[in-house]
Amino acid sequence: MTQSSHINRRFVLAKRPQGMPTREDIVLKEEDVPQPGKGQMLLRTLYLSLDPYMRGRMDDAESYSAPLEIGDVIVGGTVCRVEKSEHPDYQQGDLVLAYSGWQDYALSDGEGLQKLDADMSHPSYALGLLGMPGFTGYMGLTDIGNPQKGETVVVAAASGAVGSVVGQVAKIRGARIVGIAGGEDKCRYVTETLKFDACVDHKAADFAEQLKKACPQGIDVYFENVGGAVFDAVLPLLNSKARVPVCGVISQYNGQNSAFSEDRLPLLMGKILKKRLRVQGFIIFQDYGDRYPEFFKQMSQWLGEGKIQFREDIVDGLENAVEAFRGLLSGKNFGKLIVKVAG
């Protein structure tokens, strides 16, 4: 079913997932398109970003953001067109970056919106390279990782939206960059297109040994966004005073048991102490929101100079969002996962 001018399709949380989300957990509802009142505007969704953090918002465990309530629209960044406006600062046709979630239409009073250039050649980049994923990779690497020329930087999910930015920015800064990805095609893309120095397939039976060979001088910066067995292989290779920015642990988002259970926590703490590691988590807009303009200017410059490559994995149709999201959580996407909701 394509987007209608009369019906608003909304994916809502019907119940909290146990493991991988299903269509019983996330259900499609249809309502009349709402009409804007004074000071409001009607946003029409063009592109929807799918990101791993959304899975955490479906649980009711304590976290850095409040959980979704049952019946809430699934959260998500969006690029929208202003369809109707009763707001003094926005006109019909304006292009905006919003967080209106998994739905065709939404009302907004302008809070949290960011205007985009109406003639932007790749509006979806506002959800990827120039949006939250790119911002996450840039700030985590440069502020916490702070790679120096000649150091070895390792990043998992290297072909993805965050990892690809981490590696390319590290190369610009003169570091040696080793990626970790799943499968030969992704590893080939990482080395041939993104120009990483090496890439290791985490699906390989001898993954840990391959990673060790790819990092003969050890690891100075490990950008953590996966966790689990990948971190197990990285930990012994970390050099003294290595930095570990932590932006996510996608391997744990569906509730799998962590490789570092409570009885192994002393091992991790011992490594942190003996090697004087800096392990720091961060929540991008909470910790670095005021530096977004700095990031946007720099990344736009690099993009214009051809120094940054970025791949999108675009799925057509809001109705396909659930299956696409499931694929994201199991590593099936290749690049920044975007749902094209309308043209």
Where are these regions (language model features)?
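Glycine-rich beta-strand-centered segment in the early N-terminal region that forms part
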Residues: 33-50, 58-102
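Glycine-rich phosphate-binding loop and adjacent beta-alpha segment
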Residues: 229-308, 340-343
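C-terminal hydrophobic helical "lid"/dimerization subdomain
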Residues: 2-6, 286-343
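Mid-domain Rossmann-like dinucleotide-binding core that forms the NAD(H)/NADP(H) cofactor-binding site
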Residues: 127-205
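Short, glycine/polar-rich helix-capping loops at beta-to-alpha or helix-loop-helix junctions
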Residues: 103-104, 182-190, 207, 264-269
